[in-house]
């Protein structure tokens, strides 16, 4: 798949999104910062990537997801948990960055911060019904299928 990428900050030419390994599902996104940013415990900030994408095809969307190491080791996750980039969005990719940890975290310029995953999308249409055809599960939810 070819994807239109717009470089909004010339410094990002050296830090384009890339797959870390041949088996990687996510492209690494980096913090486009002029200076280090310190996130205090509980603080959230919006971090620019210096990049914009245009998927164009409504059959695709992009997800901005946290990097597992930052979350596990430092408590750095996404403030919105998952960022959804619609196919018609053309603005800068921004990363809502939340320090849910107990200590301050310093985010350095061009540090890998999140990952971008391209996913297929199916746009549903609704068929309004008065009743559903009964299923084995029915309305059971939140633990209704048991623990084991």
Curated annotation (Swiss-Prot):
InterPro entries: dUTPase, dUTPase-like, dUTPase-like_sf, dUTPase_trimeric. Substrate binds at residues 67-69, 80, 84-86, 94. GO terms for molecular function: dUTP diphosphatase activity; magnesium ion binding. Its EC number is 3.6.1.23. SUPFAM superfamilies: dUTPase-like (SSF51283). Signal peptide: none annotated. Pathway: Pyrimidine metabolism; dUMP biosynthesis; dUMP from dCTP (dUTP route): step 2/2. One of its GO terms (biological process) is dUMP biosynthetic process. The keyword Translocase does not apply. It comes from the Bacteria. It catalyses: dUTP + H2O = dUMP + diphosphate + H(+). Gene3D superfamilies: 2.70.40.10. Keywords: Hydrolase, Magnesium, Metal-binding, Nucleotide metabolism. Its cofactor is Mg(2+). This enzyme is involved in nucleotide metabolism: it produces dUMP, the immediate precursor of thymidine nucleotides and it decreases the intracellular concentration of dUTP so that uracil cannot be incorporated into DNA. Belongs to the dUTPase family. This is Deoxyuridine 5'-triphosphate nucleotidohydrolase. It comes from Burkholderia cenocepacia (strain HI2424). The gene is dut.
């Amino acid at each position: 798949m070819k994807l239109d990428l717009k470089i909004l900050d010339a410094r990002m030419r050296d830090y384009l999104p890339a797959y870390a390994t041949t088996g990687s599902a996510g492209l690494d996104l980096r913090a486009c910062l002029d200076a280090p940013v310190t996130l205090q415990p509980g603080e959230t900030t919006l971090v620019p990537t210096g990049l914009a994408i245009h998927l164009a095809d409504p059959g695709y969307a992009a997800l901005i997801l946290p990097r597992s190491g930052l979350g596990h080791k430092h408590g750095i996750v996404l403030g919105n948990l998952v960022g959804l980039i619609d196919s018609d969005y053309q603005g800068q990719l921004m990363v809502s960055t939340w320090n849910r940890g107990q200590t301050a975290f310093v985010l350095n310029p061009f540090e890998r911060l999140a990952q971008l995953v391209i996913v297929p999308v199916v746009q549903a249409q609704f068929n309004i019904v008065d009743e559903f055809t009964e299923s084995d599960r029915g309305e059971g939810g939140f633990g209704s299928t048991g623990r084991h």
